[in-house]
């Protein structure tokens, strides 16, 4: 598996570095730091003097970036795989997406780039930064967003919205991305339309039949995962998809949510599916998003 680790020196970025200990040895590991160098304007300074200032600034930023990459390389787990360092200038999201394509990456790993957090309860809302959003929607491969220290990688929650979602998840899991064995809980949520009216036996029977169909679907996917070496079982519930995913992740104390980024109706390449969007803004643990 080819892995691209994008770093920026933030706490979440270092958490992403440490999270690599839970992933399989990479055939090729690229350490990338993208420099978004914005030169200040000097309207009252002669051009030749401003040029000297800009050159000094560029050199200082590059040296800082090289030191960051050296430190990251020193923190890699022993089994991380052969690594190379890349220091590039440009808008981070564009550089990361381009590098992922150039290196034919199977996985991008990065810390959550957030604008801030809202909410006073146990589940805060993360305002996903534009860099994270663009990478999630435009990257050619799966992306792991790490939102804090990762202490384990055993319990994986895999929400599925349909057959295409399941096929994409299986393709990714066939890469055997994890270092140690994991337990996968597959979850499918039948959107709630409200309880049947009292005495409406036909509506109640129809709702039960739909839930049984979803249970059969998720059990079938779990069986396919077991066939390729995973511990897996399925759960089918009724409710609001994003809420049920977050609830299940909290109940199971999931170490990772593995999910698709697009809705069932073919959300465009530049817009996250509504369920993925909601989960990413309140993620209780790292999220690994696949296409």
Language-model regions: role of each:
Residues 39, 55-59, 63, 67, ...:
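Structural beta-alpha unit
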Residues 51-67, 204-216:
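A short acidic, glycine-rich active-site loop
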Residues 143, 281-291:
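Short, flexible loop segments at boundaries between secondary-structure elements
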């Amino acid at each position: 598996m080819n892995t691209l680790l994008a770093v920026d020196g933030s706490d979440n970025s270092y958490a992403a570095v440490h999270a690599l200990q839970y992933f399989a040895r990479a055939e090729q590991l690229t350490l990338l730091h993208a420099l978004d160098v914005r030169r200040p304007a000097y309207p009252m300074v002669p051009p030749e003097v401003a040029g000297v200032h800009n050159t000094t600034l560029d050199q200082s930023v590059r040296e800082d970036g090289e030191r960051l990459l050296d430190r990251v390389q020193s923190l890699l787990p022993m089994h991380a795989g052969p690594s190379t360092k890349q220091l590039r200038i440009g808008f981070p999201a564009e550089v990361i997406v381009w590098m992922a394509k150039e290196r034919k990456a199977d996985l991008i790993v990065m810390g959550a780039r957030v604008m801030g957090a809202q909410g006073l309860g146990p589940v805060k809302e993360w305002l996903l930064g534009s860099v994270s959003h663009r990478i999630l929607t435009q990257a050619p491969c799966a992306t792991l967003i790490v939102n804090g220290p990762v202490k384990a990688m055993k319990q994986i929650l895999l929400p599925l919205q349909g057959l295409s979602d399941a096929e994409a998840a299986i393709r990714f899991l066939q890469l055997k991305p994890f270092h140690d064995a994991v337990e996968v809980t597959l979850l499918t949520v039948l959107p709630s339309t409200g309880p049947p009216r009292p005495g409406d036996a036909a509506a109640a029977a129809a709702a039960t039949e739909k839930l049984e169909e979803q249970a059969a679907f998720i059990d079938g996917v779990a069986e396919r995962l077991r066939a390729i070496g995973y511990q897996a079982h399925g759960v089918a519930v009724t409710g609001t998809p994003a809420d049920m995913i977050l609830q299940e992740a909290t109940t199971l104390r999931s170490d990772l949510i593995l999910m698709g980024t697009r809705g069932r109706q073919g959300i465009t390449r530049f817009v996250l599916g509504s369920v993925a969007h909601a989960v990413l803004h309140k993620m209780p643990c790292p999220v690994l998003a696949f296409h």
